[in-house]
Structures are given as C-alpha cells and as structure tokens.
Amino acid sequence: MISDRPRAWNSTLPVPAKPMGRDKGLAKGKSAATRRTRPETGFSRAVKLAVRTRAGSGDPDQARCECCGIWLGRYGGQVQHIVARGMGGTSNPVLSTAANGALLAGTAQSGCHGLAESRDLGMKRTGFWLPQGTDPRMVPMVLWSGRRVYRAVDGLGPDGTGYLTGAPQEVAA
C-alpha cells in the first residue's frame, strides 16, 4: 500500500506505507544468521589489539601508523601482514602473530598499507613487507621516527612496548 504523503526531501514520489523488511532477498525459511559467511583468515582480534597497542606506545587509542606516524586512534588504519599468507593460507604459526603485523594508514589500495600491498621497494627496505619464506621476527622494521626495531611475537616484548631492540636470538643471549 502506498501513502499519499510526499517524501521528506520534497520528492513528488509517494512513500511506501510500510518499510521493506530486512529479510527480503533471503530464501524462505533462512535467517541472516544461517547464511554461510566467509571464514576469518586474517589476524585474530587479540593480535590486532596487540599490534594497535604496540603502535600506540601502550595505548590503543593513541595508535599511529608505524610507517608514516599519522595518528590513527583505536579504529583507523589496518593491520598489514608483513609476510603474506598466500592463497591457501599457511601452516607457519609465526605468520598469525603480532611479529608478522604492522599497523598502517589507509586501506589495501591506499596510503601506507596500499604501498606495502603494491610491494613498494621502499616499504620492503623499511620492513613493512617481506617475501614469502622470510621469518618476520628476524628482519627489523624502521618506524616513522627512524627507530630500528624488531617485533615481538606476543605483541608485548620484555619491556611491554611490543618492540625488541635486537633480533630475538641476540636478545635471548
């Protein structure tokens, strides 16, 4: 049934009397909860929070892009896989840890994250992407401040910053 009152933005088209339900388009008897969704293949929420906390010097609300230093806050930017997992995923457990993540500004098509995804050589030199087969724990990353650091697997490191000053075998010695 169509009502006679015009739309709010002064259109002459009539307004439907009842809005369409959210379940339009689903097969009969199926709810939105039963639809198959794509499995989560990225970092876990805990790892994303650890990387964001590391980038915010202990406070995820103060997170900055680890490459350019722009302020991102709690919800800006994206966590980049430094060593890509590959199309079939990976069996290497290190690639799912905070040692393989960097918080970068932009999306996979823009900003620092876009540069890393496009395999920019400058991003490779600063450690924001590495070829497959590389151990991300052993290659340093150059932060926006110019500081050269290694990433801790647990996202915390010995001093709680998430960064190591030397390669893991050097720190352990």
Task: Label the predicted regions.
Residues V83-G101:
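Short linker/helix segments within small regulatory modules
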Residues I70-G73, L95-R125:
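Short Cys/His-centered divalent metal-binding micro-motifs
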Residues M1-R64, G69-G73, L130-A173:
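A boundary/linker detector
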Residues H81-G89, G122-Q132:
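Short cysteine/histidine-rich metal-coordination sites, predominantly Zn2+-binding motifs
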Residues Q78-A84, Q109-S110:
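Histidine-centered catalytic micro-motifs
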Residues R36, G89-T90, A108:
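Residue-level detector of alpha-helix boundaries and kinks
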Residues D61, Q78, A99-G101, R137:
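Residues that flank catalytic or metal-binding motifs in active/ligand-binding sites
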